[in-house]
Amino acid sequence: MSEAALDLAPDAGAAAPPSWETIAPPAPGELLVVVGPTASGKTELAIRLAERFGGEVVSADSVQIYREFDLGSGKPTPAERARAAHHLVDAVDPLQAIDAQRFAELAEAAIDDIRGRGRVPVVCGGTFLWVKALVLGLSPAPPADPEARARHRAIADAEGRAALHARLAAVDPESAARLAPNDLVRVSRALEIYERSGRTQSAWHAEHGFRERRHAARLLAVHRDRAELDHRIEARVAGWLEQGWVDEVRSLLSRGYGDARAMGSVGYRQVREHLEGRLPADELAPAIVRATRTFVRRQRTWLRDQAVAYVALP
């Protein structure tokens, strides 16, 4: 591939990470949280930990939570769900909007339920804003406003998403610099915060500081070397396409789910572009791989600032 392969490693010169089997059971009240980039093996590690410690998995994935969005979300298979119960997978209707705050509320309820039955919750997911919301809470910025979101969507539809992103850049360049123009939901949210409060999203985040933990959490991730992770991404995309991903998206669009938040996620967005004639068939898989790798780079940026214990997993 033309771009440099990806790496998920604690340090290029570090010793090999320990086996996942060395992970100690959680202390009382401690929350095990499996993080890591797409295709690194989070689901398998979470299931093994649940099997080992008598636990259940709580998904922290902003696409897996929706029903109908199956192949391209990497949902656990029926066989995997038979090994460990999963929460917040196939939990809500595709057109229901779930943000980080609502996820944290749902996850807290699931964690309380699991612990109430004497079992161990294992959080697993690559939507790191959701993980942060659960572990650290969110900044006290103004709550979401559906009217503002609808207004911003109308601007994006009429003038293009780049135009909405430019509006954000004019008032909050720091947020605009970290958000892709196509990320309509997050661009709209950042712009909405400024419009409603007169302060940038970055200023709200700086004020919060995210220093007081709501949970004593231990972050775990699977170590993958560059070539291995790159291969896993390509194989995953190819496999999903062979299993009928295009047909799944075609069905979703035909049933009125074109405005579902998950339809704008990596992979689903590219398949939709293909079905709408904007992306040739022979360019579909490479486009999804490129978008996935871009997303993984953003995930890795977040991981670099966290205290993550890396383990080896076959």
From Swiss-Prot:
Binding, ATP: G36, P37, T38, A39, S40, G41, K42, T43
Record EC number: 2.5.1.75
GO BP term (any one): tRNA modification
UniProt keyword terms in alphabetical order: ATP-binding, Magnesium, Nucleotide-binding, Transferase, tRNA processing
Site (Interaction with substrate tRNA): T127, R149
Cofactor needs: Mg(2+)
EC top class named in words: transferase
Matches recorded under InterPro entries: Dimethylallyltransferase, IPT, P-loop_NTPase
Gene3D superfamilies, A to Z: 1.10.20.140, P-loop containing nucleotide triphosphate hydrolases
Region of interest called Interaction with substrate tRNA, as start-end residue ranges on this chain: 61-64
Reaction(s) catalysed by this chain's protein: adenosine(37) in tRNA + dimethylallyl diphosphate = N(6)-dimethylallyladenosine(37) in tRNA + diphosphate
MF terms (GO), sorted A to Z: ATP binding; tRNA dimethylallyltransferase activity
Residue sites binding substrate per the record: T38, A39, S40, G41, K42, T43
Family of the protein in this entry: Belongs to the IPP transferase family.
Its job: Catalyzes the transfer of a dimethylallyl group onto the adenine at position 37 in tRNAs that read codons beginning with uridine, leading to the formation of N6-(dimethylallyl)adenosine (i(6)A).
Subunit relationships: Monomer.
Protein name in UniProt: tRNA dimethylallyltransferase
